[in-house]
A protein has these predicted regions:
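An N-terminally biased module of ancient metal coordination in phosphate/nucleic-acid-related enzymes
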Residues: 1-36
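Catalytic pocket-lining loop regions of alpha/beta-barrel enzymes
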Residues: 84-85, 98-200
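N-terminal cationic-hydrophobic initiation segments that often serve targeting/anchoring roles
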Residues: 26, 49-53, 78, 143, ...
């Protein structure tokens, strides 16, 4: 868990209607639509989809260790949910799978064929797992091999955020998500990139 990194983490365990509470918070802060990680071990995703179909879209976390069986699972869930992206946590997979590992190539190809972006944690992970699978330099090879892949770096890319910005200049389909950061903590290299390059 990465809770050690955050202050005043809200306790939502005792909320009777988590989906309704989420909608209330979205309305409070002017959020029209939310991107949810599709968790097949919970009924909450189906509830969110059915109660508020216009308010939620889904990214589907994948485990590349399951190979083609995982591809079959993805296809099945895409028929049930409005899946807009796949997502991958390299350091959190078990066994760990690096960003540029051969196990990932079938998923990158799937994303290209289905016009889906892939959201990939990059940089030192918040949870206390080894960081090697998420080193930003590994993204360079993937972008070279899959020039049509929409690859989104998420959760900071630190301490290689300057390299992340440089790679975005190099590869037109490489993007950066500000996930896991409050705006006051955005890395300066990313702010500079946003203000000077591809800002649209």
């Amino acid at each position: 868990p990465a809770q050690y990194m955050f202050k005043d983490v809200p306790d939502v365990a005792n909320i009777a209607d988590p989906v309704g509470y989420t909608i209330e918070q979205m309305d409070k802060y002017g959020i029209e639509r939310a991107f949810l990680a599709l968790n097949t071990f919970s009924d909450m995703n189906a509830e969110a989809r059915d109660r508020f179909p216009d308010r939620f879209v889904f990214d589907l976390p994948i485990d590349p260790n399951y190979g083609m069986d995982e591809i079959a699972r993805i296809r099945g869930l895409m028929k049930e949910y409005d899946v807009r992206a796949l997502s991958f946590f390299p350091s959190g997979s078990y066994p760990q799978v690096a960003i540029n590992a051969k196990e990932m190539y079938v998923f990158y190809a799937f994303c290209v064929d289905n016009d889906l972006p892939i959201l990939v944690n990059a940089g030192v992970p918040g949870p206390r797992y080894p960081m090697a699978p998420q080193m930003v330099e590994l993204i360079d090879e993937v972008c070279w091999f899959f020039p049509d892949l929409k690859f989104v770096m998420r959760h900071g890319t630190e301490p290689w955020e300057a390299l992340a910005a440089k790679l975005m200049l190099k590869w037109p389909n490489l993007y950066y998500s500000t996930s896991a950061f409050a705006p006051k903590h955005y890395p300066s290299a990313i702010i500079h990139f946003a203000n000077t390059s591809r800002a649209d």
